[in-house]
Amino acid sequence: MSGLGLQGVTVETVLQNPSLQAGSTLHGEISFKGGSSDKEINGLYLQLVTMAEVESGDHEFNQPLVLQEWLVNSRFLLPAHQAHSFPFSIQLPFETPITEVACRRNGARVWIQTHMDVDWGLDATDRDYLKVLPTPAMQMFLQAMQRCGFVLSTVDVEKGQLTARNFRSTIGCYQELEFVSSH
């Protein structure tokens, strides 16, 4: 389209604290600029996304899974070539998968997807990866497993829900930590 002299809307998100723990508040700013013509924007969204392993019959595959979505701004008119920005603060769910752990194979990825829904135009998107650190309780668990003679081998995220006596997961996935004996 830009070859025809039509420039689309652009969006860029800058995260102030991309390294954080689950349950913490993420701060940032979304900057965007209008294209070659005025555009009606249906909404500006932030999505917390992970790559989840999905089991289907005898097969497994990975697919992006939206864990939570926040509406930053609803319908508005974006004039041609005008630049705007919105600061934001969002709290990550306490069940957000951790990504920063020492292991042999870490398949956990978490990112913020910015999505601008452009009416009658190409939607503008941006992806920014997060470093989700273990909480103090998770750190204590990982250290206890190590003291018991186990090494964290594999970390991944699986689509599904966990249910226990007084708990039910809420984000549509769970994190799997696989340990092996260090002996």
Where do the protein language model's features map onto the residues?
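C-terminal beta-sandwich interaction modules and adjacent acidic
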Residues: 1-183
